[in-house]
């Protein structure tokens, strides 16, 4: 019988060249090829899109309005499709309420666990809060030694101010003879006058007994009487012993701290029943940050040390500041840091109740006199932020504020009541601070009573199962309370992967986009095993991937190419990895078999004395490390996932340099000092954030080449005759653009119960410009034709205009020759956006004093693309600039001049320097995981060179 398969015929999405392919079902299929070759077009835009469309089409119109309608992909037929699930990197929630625990649903089970077997404790007295029946109280008292004398007391006043005369009188009228007031037994008729300004505790003596058999009935009656008098509280005064406290309700018998019935919603920070009332469950509050208010403490007040009060059109605040300094004799020409602590406190937090009189010039002209209490700069910013009706003022004030942990819940997000419930010795706020590996260990060994164990058994099974899946995809270092908005694309994707395995679905088609991103080679095996486990459940996996190990582990490998863009879109080779390796036409096969490779450089640039020195870096999990980053060479920062690479490079290095060089308001991670910044004049962070958030932004506008192209069109004879200036050829301003679509080229049509539909503008036919503008041509092409050209085509078209050719060539050099000049920024992948940014920096003149910071540069890149990119980075270094890269890819690591390896583990087990030096030095370091894999690569490359 023929093996089941997915048969695709006539796929033409994007650059696909009418391809036919048969893919085996229930196998691990890896699709690879150059960046832009058409992998995603086949995997996501054809196979997944059709699988999803068919599923959605089977639903009712009502259900479809929530799921969105998908267009039919440009393909003749696809047979053998299963329901499709896509796990990509773009759907990370930026909601501050979303955490690793909530996304994976682990938190739902933890909440249930605390609601079912949690034990509430009084936060003031650290005693367990229990609700007890009268029978339980009797049993506990009868456990006392025989002949023990006891008094049953009803606490009617607990530590409250007042003389309480009326209450004492009422107790006497009810027939009670004795009271215990502040620990002393007194007759109800001889109570001394109580000081109404002091706290008092008054307890009614309900009964006096000797513990012996046969008193149970009398004891129960007396307990009931006491509980009625004191609203459910009872104190047993054991003569010559310690008092026993009992409570009929969930309340502390000493202070009355009460807690309602334990429910799962009580432990949710997204519910008003559980959230901290101060921060509404966010764990953080926007607070004025003194370091942003006074960013440069070497400045004097006259030089503008207090940044929010630097003079503007009104001199209200500068005049007030001057008057305050006169009154309190503060020298305005003294550096802020040299002022006394008292003087700084007055300026920042106010002068108390003392009123200050001053005269200031109004914005409209004229002077005005004011008398007011000086509130201080910090309270002033906070007040204006919270009370101002002006959006502009609030935005300006927010620049001087930062998110700090909430002072009530200390960042734990929950109410005091929720944090008073314990399971296995920890409250829920403490548990979610654990990393996944710590939490897994904790729940596997949790100590519960036999009864609680029986109740919690099924819940614990679910928690342990989900934690195990997360652990198996290399995420053991993530803490459960980590905000999902701070996760990298690869981490977010692996979390969704773990969630899918947890669902144990079978017969599903999963389409994944580079799940190995951000994963160290050490953790790759676990990821591959996870993928195989999903396959073994009876699912088909299509993985778009460039990672060597994943390609070798595939059951079926598809190489798409041979080039990118117009030069791609064909199946170059398909079959087992061994078959593809033998195929001479397959570029991927050549690299996999070692016939082609990225060579180790013949020499490495030595680390010079010029360096940036970071001392005492403590951001996130960094353990107060000292690091030197040599200048004018290529440094790669390595380490297992979660070892502290991003904390060091992005949080400490980049943000501190941005603060000093660019005068940025970002707040760096914690460190003691950084030296050597004066050797740099420019810092460029090339990350994967979009180059623009609107369809109007594109590679041509971002790199600035579109300005030069518009200049060329404005210089043509036709444009001069018509009097067209450069602005005529912009689609962002009135004049040359099509006014029907405002230069977008597309028009949005609202479909109400269906998703919005975008259709080409009928007036300009999607060209963005009006007819008159399009009549102006250069070498037979109008401005709209230029935007539809690929970068490669445009480079040839403008080869005689050096200024334009140089900028376009940099895009080709970074492997973006296949992208069209007018491609909407919103449709570029993270890796493509990153390379557009790199290209726009490349054509700028180098000062030799720039530092480039790149994070996971190889995302979405084939080995051949990486080879080209390394040449570009080396060009930057040859100019004297510094390149710092966070990277796991061994081809990049082996070509570095200098490596900083962090670790040894992830999360709390990381944050230290494992090794520094050349790749050869790291390869010899036995404690380095990176060194272990690097050694294999260097030896393999050496062997291949000798074989040749």
UniProtKB/Swiss-Prot annotation:
Binding positions (ATP): 33-40, 639-646
Gene Ontology MF: a single term: excinuclease ABC activity
GO biological process: nucleotide-excision repair; SOS response
Any single GO CC term annotated in Swiss-Prot or TrEMBL for this entry: cytoplasm
Top-level taxonomic group: Bacteria
Start and end residues, zinc fingers (C4-type): 252-279, 738-764
Alphabetic keyword roster: ATP-binding, Cytoplasm, DNA damage, DNA excision, DNA repair, DNA-binding, Excision nuclease, Metal-binding, Nucleotide-binding, Repeat, SOS response, Zinc, Zinc-finger
Chief place where the protein resides: cytoplasm
Subcellular location: Cytoplasm
Coiled-coil intervals, chain numbering: none
InterPro entries: ABC_transporter-like_ATP-bd, ABC_transporter-like_CS, P-loop_NTPase, UvrA, UvrA_DNA-bd, UvrA_inter
Domain ABC transporter intervals: 309-587, 607-935
PANTHER family: UVRABC SYSTEM PROTEIN A
Family the UniProt entry places it in: Belongs to the ABC transporter superfamily. UvrA family.
Functional note: The UvrABC repair system catalyzes the recognition and processing of DNA lesions. UvrA is an ATPase and a DNA-binding protein. A damage recognition complex composed of 2 UvrA and 2 UvrB subunits scans DNA for abnormalities. When the presence of a lesion has been verified by UvrB, the UvrA molecules dissociate.
Summary of subunit composition and partner proteins: Forms a heterotetramer with UvrB during the search for lesions.
Protein name (Swiss-Prot/TrEMBL): UvrABC system protein A
Source species of the chain: Staphylococcus aureus (strain Mu50 / ATCC 700699)
Gene symbol of the encoding locus: uvrA
């Amino acid at each position: 019988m023929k093996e089941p398969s997915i048969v695709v015929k006539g796929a033409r999405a994007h650059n696909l060249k009418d391809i036919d392919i048969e893919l085996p079902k229930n196998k691990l299929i890896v699709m690879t090829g150059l960046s832009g070759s058409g992998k995603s077009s086949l995997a996501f835009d054809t196979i997944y899109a059709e699988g999803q469309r068919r599923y959605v089409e089977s639903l009712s119109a009502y259900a479809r309005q929530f799921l969105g309608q998908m267009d039919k992909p440009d393909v003749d037929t696809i047979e053998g499709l299963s329901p499709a699930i896509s796990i990509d990197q773009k759907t990370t929630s930026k909601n501050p309420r979303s955490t690793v625990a909530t996304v994976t649903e682990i938190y739902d089970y933890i909440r249930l666990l605390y609601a079912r077997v949690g034990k509430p404790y009084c936060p003031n007295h650290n005693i367990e809060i229990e609700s007890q029946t009268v029978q339980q109280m009797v049993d506990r008292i009868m456990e006392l030694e025989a002949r023990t004398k006891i008094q049953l007391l009803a606490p009617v006043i607990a530590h409250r101010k007042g003389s309480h005369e009326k209450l004492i009188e009422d107790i006497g009228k009810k027939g009670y003879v004795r009271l215990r007031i502040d620990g002393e037994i007194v007759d109800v008729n001889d109570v001394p006058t109580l000081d109404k300004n002091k706290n008092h505790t008054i307890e009614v003596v309900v009964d006096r007994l000797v513990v012996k058999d046969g008193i149970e009935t009398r004891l129960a009656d007396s307990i009931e009487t006491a509980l009625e008098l004191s609203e459910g509280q009872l104190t047993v005064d054991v003569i010559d012993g310690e008092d026993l406290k009992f409570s009929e309700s969930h309340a502390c018998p000493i202070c009355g701290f009460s807690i309602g019935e334990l429910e799962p919603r009580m432990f949710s920070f997204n519910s008003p029943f559980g959230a901290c009332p101060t921060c509404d469950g966010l764990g953080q509050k926007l607070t004025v940050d003194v370091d942003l208010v006074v960013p440069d403490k070497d400045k004097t007040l006259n030089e503008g040390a207090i940044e929010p009060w630097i003079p503007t059109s009104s001199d209200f605040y500068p005049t007030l500041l001057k008057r305050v300094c006169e009154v309190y004799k503060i020298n305005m020409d003294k550096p802020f840091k040299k002022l006394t602590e008292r003087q700084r406190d007055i300026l920042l937090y106010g002068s108390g109740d003392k009123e200050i009189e001053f005269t200031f010039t109004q914005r409209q002209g004229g002077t005005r006199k004011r008398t007011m209490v000086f509130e201080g700069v910090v309270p002033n910013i906070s007040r204006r932020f919270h009370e101002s009706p002006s959006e502009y003022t609030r935005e300006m004030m927010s620049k001087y504020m930062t998110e700090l942990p909430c002072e009530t819940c200390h960042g734990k997000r929950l109410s005091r009541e929720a944090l008073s419930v314990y399971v296995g010795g920890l409250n829920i706020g403490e548990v979610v601070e654990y990393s996944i590996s710590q939490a897994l260990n904790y729940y596997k060994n949790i100590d519960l009573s036999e009864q609680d164990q029986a109740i919690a058994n099924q819940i614990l099974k679910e928690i342990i199962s989900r934690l195990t899946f997360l652990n198996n995809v290399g995420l053991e270092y993530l803490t459960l309370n980590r905000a999902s908005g701070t996760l990298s694309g690869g981490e977010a994707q692996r979390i969704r992967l773990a969630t899918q395995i947890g669902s144990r679905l079978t017969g599903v088609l999963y389409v994944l986009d580079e799940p190995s991103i951000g994963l160290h080679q050490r953790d790759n095996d676990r990821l591959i095993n996870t993928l195989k486990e999903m396959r073994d459940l009876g699912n088909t996996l299509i993985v778009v991937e460039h990672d060597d190990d994943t390609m070798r582990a595939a059951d079926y490998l598809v190489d798409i190419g041979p080039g990118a863009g117009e030069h791609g879109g064909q199946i170059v080779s398909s079959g087992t990895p061994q078959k593809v390796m033998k195929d001479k036409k397959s570029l991927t096969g050549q690299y996999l078999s070692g016939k082609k490779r990225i060579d180790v450089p013949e020499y490495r640039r030595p680390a010079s004395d010029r360096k940036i020195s970071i001392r005492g870096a403590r951001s996130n999990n960094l353990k107060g490390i000292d690091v030197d980053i040599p200048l004018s060479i290529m440094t790669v920062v390595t380490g297992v996932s979660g070892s502290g690479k991003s904390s060091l490079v992005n949080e400490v290095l980049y943000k501190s340099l941005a603060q000093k060089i660019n005068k940025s308001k970002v707040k760096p991670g914690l460190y003691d000092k950084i030296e050597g910044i004066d050797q740099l004049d420019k810092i460029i962070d090339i990350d994967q954030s979009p180059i623009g958030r609107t369809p109007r932004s594109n590679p041509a506008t971002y790199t600035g080449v579109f300005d030069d192209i518009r200049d060329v069109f404005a210089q043509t004879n036709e444009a001069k005759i018509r009097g067209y200036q450069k602005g005529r050829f912009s689609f962002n301003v009135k004049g040359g653009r099509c006014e029907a679509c405002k230069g977008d080229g597309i028009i949005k049509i609202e479909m109400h119960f269906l998703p919005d539909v975008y259709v080409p503008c009928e007036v300009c036919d999607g060209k963005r410009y009006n007819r008159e503008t399009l009549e102006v041509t250069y070498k037979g092409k109008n401005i709209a034709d230029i935007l539809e050209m690929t970068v490669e085509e445009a480079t040839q078209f403008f080869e005689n205009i050096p200024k334009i050719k140089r900028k376009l060539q940099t895009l080709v050099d970074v492997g973006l020759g296949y992208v069209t000049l007018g491609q909407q920024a919103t449709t570029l992948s993270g890796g493509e956006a990153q390379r557009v940014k790199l290209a726009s920096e490349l054509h700028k003149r180098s000062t030799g004093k720039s530092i480039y910071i790149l994070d996971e540069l190889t995302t979405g890149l084939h080995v051949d693309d990486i080879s080209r990119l390394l040449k570009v980075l080396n060009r930057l270094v040859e100019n004297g600039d510094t390149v710092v890269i966070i990277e796991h890819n061994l081809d990049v690591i082996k070509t570095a001049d200098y490596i900083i390896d962090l670790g040894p583990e992830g999360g709390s087990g990381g944050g230290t320097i494992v090794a520094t030096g050349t790749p050869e030095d790291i390869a010899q370091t036995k404690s380095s995981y990176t060194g272990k894999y690097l050694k294999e690569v260097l030896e393999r490359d050496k062997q291949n060179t000798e074989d040749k």
